[in-house]
């Protein structure tokens, strides 16, 4: 660019110098060059024009070259700037990567330090806890040491006192003191054990029994020892008695039932403790009344016929009960045995209906606990089958039931259930326990069974006498038909801790001395009153 400008300047200077030279020459040779002046001027003009054209051309060329050089320089500068920027960015990128790695290492180190700090804090807490524990133990040891020293002093004083006693007196004093000291601990342990057992079992047991009772609705007709037979008129009484009482004696001898004919209008009473015989007598007497032929031969014929009919009815009762309980493949002899329970009662409760109810309850409880429902229902259904034949075979109904269950190849769980439902042997399965619970639930619920008034009063009187036999008992009351005994104690003789022990002693004596269905609740009440008067 500078060279071009210098070239232009040089050209201009050359032109100026040439013009000056021509002017001088023209001036010096004015006279000689007038002819050529116009030519010279013209040449000068031409030269000037050409110089201007050349200068303009040179200027344009210089501008184009300058513009091209500027673009080239600009591109070169941009390329250099780009390369420099890339180098700078690469350096920044490397530095950022290093910074990032450094930050990561610092974060990891910080996390490690935090963990170490937490571990140190945790160890410090543990050490503080151990230190506190050691301090507490040290205090406890000091307290125990003081107690031991105090006890040693007391024992020393007691030994000094005992030294003047006989061996028997000293033993009695020591035993009394030991019992008094252990009374509180025994009562506390009993309360804790009872509370723990109640917390874990009462709610579950109540829920299970409530569900079982809600899902089963049983009905019973109270059984009696007498049966009334309605007569069309009172004249039939004489025909039943017969000449010289032959008819009534024949009926009584064949059935083993007392036929009572009194002043009750149009009624004959059949009395007997065997419901099957009483039912046969009823069927026979009703058949005689309907037939009208009443004489010893006809009575014998109808008694035999009704015995066969009774066998069929017994089998039908057994089949219906087995179908109701869902006991398939029951041996025909067992079906007949179970049918006979329709005519057996226990405390006024029909034994067959009781067996069906126990089977259903046991099945419900087994279902709630995930046991074999069908086996539980079968075991509950057969648990009292020995009652159908215990009058004909020696042994208790439990022993007879076990024998027949083994004879007819019943499941071992069924055999053990029959053996254990009254506590004669230990239950080997959960089903045996469930059947025992269902048996108690069915038989002990209010209204399920009846007792005679005399036995009822005697049982209540015995219950109250057992309670009042203990020292410190002020009064006792048998409540809820003998299912609860409420004991009022003298507060100056019985302490709060001794109340718990007294309730257990009363319970043990009741269990050893009384026979009763279900459970008896023992409640001991200690009441301390302080009365004063403001004057």
From Swiss-Prot:
The EC number(s) this enzyme carries: 3.1.-.-
Membrane topology field: Single-pass membrane protein
GO biological process, one term: mRNA catabolic process
UniProt keyword Membrane, yes or no: yes
PROSITE patterns: HD (PS51831), KH_TYPE_1 (PS50084)
One cellular-component annotation, GO: plasma membrane
Pfam families: HD, KH_1, RNase_Y_N
Domain KH, residue spans: 225-285
Region span, Disordered: 118-141
Predominant location: membrane
Enzyme class: hydrolase
Positions of transmembrane segments: 4-24
Domain annotation HD: ranges: 351-444
Molecular function GO terms recorded: RNA binding; RNA endonuclease activity
Domain of life: Bacteria
Subcellular location: Cell membrane
SMART domains: HDc (SM00471), KH (SM00322)
Keyword line: Cell membrane, Endonuclease, Hydrolase, Membrane, Nuclease, RNA-binding, Transmembrane, Transmembrane helix
Entries under InterPro entries matching the protein: HD/PDEase_dom, HD_domain, HDIG_dom, KH_dom, KH_dom_type_1, KH_dom_type_1_sf, Ribonuclease_Y, RNase_Y_N
HAMAP family: RNase_Y (MF_00335)
Cited PANTHER family: RIBONUCLEASE Y (PTHR12826:SF15)
Record's function text: Endoribonuclease that initiates mRNA decay.
Family: Belongs to the RNase Y family.
Record's protein name: Ribonuclease Y
Source taxonomy: Bacteria, Bacillati, Bacillota, Bacilli, Lactobacillales
């Amino acid at each position: 660019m500078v060279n071009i400008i210098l070239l232009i300047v040089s050209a201009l200077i050359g032109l100026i110098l040439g013009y000056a030279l021509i002017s001088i020459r023209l001036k010096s040779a004015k006279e000689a060059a007038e002819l050529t002046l116009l030519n010279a001027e013209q040449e000068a003009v031409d030269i000037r024009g050409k110089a201007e054209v050349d200068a303009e051309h040179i200027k344009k060329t210089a501008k184009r070259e300058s513009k091209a050089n500027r673009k080239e320089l600009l591109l070169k500068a941009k390329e250099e700037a780009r390369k420099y920027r890339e180098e700078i960015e690469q350096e920044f990128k490397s530095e950022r990567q290093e910074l990032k790695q450094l930050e990561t290492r610092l974060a990891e180190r910080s996390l490690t330090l935090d963990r170490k700090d937490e571990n140190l804090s945790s160890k410090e807490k543990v050490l503080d806890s151990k230190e506190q524990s050691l301090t507490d133990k040290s205090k406890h040891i000091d307290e125990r040491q003081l107690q031991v020293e105090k006890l040693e002093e007391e024992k020393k004083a007691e030994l000094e006192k005992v030294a003047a006693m006989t061996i028997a007196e000293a033993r009695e004093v020591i035993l009394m003191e030991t019992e008094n000291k252990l009374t509180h601990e025994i009562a506390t342990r009993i309360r804790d054990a009872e509370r723990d057992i109640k917390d874990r079992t009462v709610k579950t047991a109540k829920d299970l029994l409530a569900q079982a009772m809600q899902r089963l609705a049983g009905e019973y007709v109270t059984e009696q020892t007498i049966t009334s037979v309605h007569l069309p008129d009172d004249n039939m009484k004489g025909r039943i008695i017969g000449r010289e009482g032959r008819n009534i004696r024949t009926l009584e001898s064949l059935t083993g039932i007392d036929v009572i004919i009194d002043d009750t209008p149009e009624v004959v009473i059949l009395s007997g403790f065997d419901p099957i015989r009483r039912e046969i007598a009823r069927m026979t007497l009703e058949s005689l009344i309907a037939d009208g032929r009443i004489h010893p031969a006809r009575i014998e014929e109808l008694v035999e016929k009704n015995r066969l009919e009774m066998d069929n009815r017994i089998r039908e009762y057994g089949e219906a009960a087995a179908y109701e309980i869902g006991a398939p493949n029951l041996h025909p002899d067992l079906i007949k045995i179970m049918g006979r329970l329709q005519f057996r009662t226990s405390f006024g409760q029909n034994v067959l209906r009781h067996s069906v109810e126990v089977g259903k309850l046991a099945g419900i409880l087994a279902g709630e606990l995930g046991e074999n429902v069908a086996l539980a229902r079968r075991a509950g259904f057969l648990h009292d089958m020995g009652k159908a034949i215990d009058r004909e075979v020696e042994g208790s109904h439990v022993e007879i039931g076990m024998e027949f269950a083994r004879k007819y190849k019943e499941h071992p769980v069924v055999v053990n259930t029959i053996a254990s439902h009254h506590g004669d042997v230990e239950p080997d399965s959960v089903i045996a326990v469930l059947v025992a619970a269902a048996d108690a639930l069915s038989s002990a619920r209010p209204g399920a069974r009846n007792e005679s008034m005399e036995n009822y009063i005697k049982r209540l009187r015995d219950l109250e006498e057992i309670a009042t036999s203990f020292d410190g008992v002020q009064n006792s009351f048998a409540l809820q038909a003998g299912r609860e005994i409420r004991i009022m104690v003298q507060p100056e003789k019985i302490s709060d801790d001794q109340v718990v022990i007294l309730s257990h002693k009363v319970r043990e004596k009741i269990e050893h001395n009384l026979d009763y269905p279900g459970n008896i609740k023992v409640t001991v009440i200690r009441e301390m009153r302080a009365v004063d008067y403001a004057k």
